[in-house]
């Protein structure tokens, strides 16, 4: 009370400007103190001055929230039981104040990032029900999908809905679950493409022999880390939906929803894609959906699916015509790369190896970081070992070519690096041994493959 009176007197005699300036000066001093401590991870010492600034000048500086998040997390980890309980509540509330006072950064909204961080911490700290967590994730995605990019949080956005669905909650239907999966999956693809665009600039420098700057190397490490995270969580996302998206579930679901959505290009495209990925394309419903999609809105996707239909009917020439139409209808180079890759997969399945490699290489010309295209080519080479070369040594030498190609996949695409290196090692294990090289006297020689491969590989040195 005494302090309150003194403040009122000060207000009366000094005026609001001077009083607020003094308060602000104290806040600035405390801001400096807690920020310096937080920078060196002395979060315990940062707590009290941070709390004062947070209470008295919540709009002073965004550091109140960026460092505040770390300070409270440290308190949750290292504080007393009472401190931990209070800090958990304070941390969740911090995100709401963050949005209130600093919803943007450099003129761009950060609401999606902040809210998704709040939802993730609600999961980590077991604060709130699955429905409450999902509501926060959904608000983040609905209000600001652009800054909602964290792979782990995107995955948990869908997984939370999946958990609600599996709990028997009638508010979440199978149709809603699949729709949300498609949304989140497409978001992952968007983020992967954004990373690929940045990475490809660096790869082109490498390919041209230009030395990478320190900044380029740092960016490459960041891109590789993020690309790997996207790969891991997208794989986990697909694993969850795989449990539900059997043909037995998909076909009756899409049959019941077709009439309502036959003029909805987004729905038709997603339904066709899901049926294709789950190998339900032999069902007549797939034909119905694809033909409706192409009639409604001819696109790269619809033409691609028509190519598949004609391949299944053994109309190879017509299938290829639709595949080419698919490529011509796509203007975005990264989407074009994905379409070319999908066509390469279809051609590989039909045993048309040379054509499949051609399409895979075209895909790489649009997206040099598309590692799975290199893996596809490596597999094409490895599967031709018995068909290329006149001697057993030369036949097995194909595996060196396959291994080299798989290693290219690992070099350009961190999201599949582990699998690509494992594949390369497997191929090398099937190639001629050092004893074979010595016996044949072929160290450093070139082995040329006159089959469809039409290239050569250098025998390793002993």
Regions found by a protein language model. Give the residues of each.
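Preference for long, solvent-exposed alpha-helical segments and helix-linker "stalks"
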Residues: 22-285, 421-427, 441-462
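Canonical positions in the second alpha-helix
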Residues: 53, 98, 140, 292-293, ...
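Bacterial Sec-dependent N-terminal signal peptides
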Residues: 1-27, 69
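Residue-level recognition of tetratricopeptide repeat
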Residues: 35, 60-61, 70, 111, 120, 147, 159, 264-265, ...
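Structural marker of alpha-solenoid helical repeat scaffolds
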Residues: 56, 101, 143, 295-296, ...
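Hydrophobic/aromatic packing residues within the alpha-helices of TPR/SEL1-like helical repeat arrays
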Residues: 50, 88-91, 95, 137, ...
